[in-house]
Amino acid sequence: MANNPSQLLPSELIDRCIGSKIWVIMKGDKELVGILKGFDVYVNMVLEDVTEYEITAEGRRVTKLDQILLNGNNIAILVPGGSPEDGE
């Protein structure tokens, strides 16, 4: 396995994030930050200690969840260690 992150396969990079905080930007108006517990070949993911950010007509709604299963088809971007506040 390569040590240089630019030479990693996407699945290897995601695998290195297991047990760490990850920022998941979904298709649509939802973003989630949580601890990645696992994923499969379809990039379906299990996150724990999750904060969900949703953009609504009233503004940004924040929801705390113990655990969530995400469908990989709805994931647009993964940011290891990041969160929406990092961009503000």
UniProtKB/Swiss-Prot annotation:
Keywords: Acetylation, Cytoplasm, mRNA processing, mRNA splicing, Nucleus, Ribonucleoprotein, RNA-binding, Spliceosome, Stress response. Changing residue 12 to K: In sad1; decreased germination rate, dwarf plants with round-shaped leaves and increased sensitivity to inhibition of seed germination and plant growth by exogenous ABA. GO terms for cellular component: Lsm1-7-Pat1 complex; Lsm2-8 complex; nucleus; P-body; plastid; spliceosomal complex. Transmembrane segments: none annotated. It holds the Pfam family LSM. The modification N-acetylalanine is found at residue 2. Gene3D superfamilies: 2.30.30.100. Disruption phenotype: Embryonic lethality when homozygous. InterPro entries: LSm5, LSM_dom_sf, Sm, Sm_dom_euk/arc. Residues 9-84 form the Sm domain. Expressed in roots, leaves, stems, flowers and siliques. GO terms for molecular function: RNA binding. PROSITE patterns: SM (PS52002). The keyword Acetylation applies. It is found in: Cytoplasm; Nucleus. One of its GO terms (biological process) is response to water deprivation. Component of LSM protein complexes, which are involved in RNA processing. Component of the cytoplasmic LSM1-LSM7 complex which is involved in mRNA degradation by promoting decapping and leading to accurate 5'-3' mRNA decay. The cytoplasmic LSM1-LSM7 complex regulates developmental gene expression by the decapping of specific development-related transcripts. Component of the nuclear LSM2-LSM8 complex which is involved splicing nuclear mRNAs. Belongs to the snRNP Sm proteins family. Component of the heptameric LSM1-LSM7 complex that forms a seven-membered ring structure with a donut shape. The LSM subunits are arranged in the order LSM1, LSM2, LSM3, LSM6, LSM5, LSM7 and LSM4. Component of the heptameric LSM2-LSM8 complex that forms a seven-membered ring structure with a donut shape. The LSM subunits are arranged in the order LSM8, LSM2, LSM3, LSM6, LSM5, LSM7 and LSM4. LSM2 subunit interacts only with its two neighboring subunits, LSM6A or LSM6B and LSM7. This is Sm-like protein LSM5. The gene is LSM5.
